Amino acid sequence: MARVKGGVVSRKRRKRILKLAKGYYGAKHILFRTAKEQVMNSYYYAYRDRRQKKRDFRKLWITRINAAARLNGLSYSQLMHGLKLAEIEVNRKMLADLAVNDATAFTALADAAKAKLGK
């Protein structure tokens, strides 16, 4: 029985990795071993950062809400507590959007929170 060298399979495997590494800098898109390492790292970064993105956006929203709340004489935590007492259920994404794009609506919410806090 003849020995099978597997050249077609190996070439296909290498070609697939190098195709994934297209656009990488330097040897990372040319040499198979470095390309393979970089593709593996890229998958890791993509997985990690899909989770990190959620945290980053939440941080951004909280920062924006805090800045707008302080313009209305409240801290972020006081505003959130006041909204909870007033039974106003609006998420941080929507609050941040109001703070940036519709200051009058945000001020109305801040006033409702102030009223419930007794300020």
Swiss-Prot record:
The keyword Hydrolase does not apply. Pfam families: Ribosomal_L20. It comes from the Bacteria. One of its GO terms (biological process) is translation. GO terms for cellular component: ribonucleoprotein complex; ribosome. Disulfide bonds: none annotated. Signal peptide: none annotated. One of its GO terms (molecular function) is rRNA binding. InterPro entries: Ribosomal_bL20, RIBOSOMAL_L20_CS, Ribosomal_protein_bL20_C. Keywords: Ribonucleoprotein, Ribosomal protein, RNA-binding, rRNA-binding. Belongs to the bacterial ribosomal protein bL20 family. This is Large ribosomal subunit protein bL20. The gene is rplT.
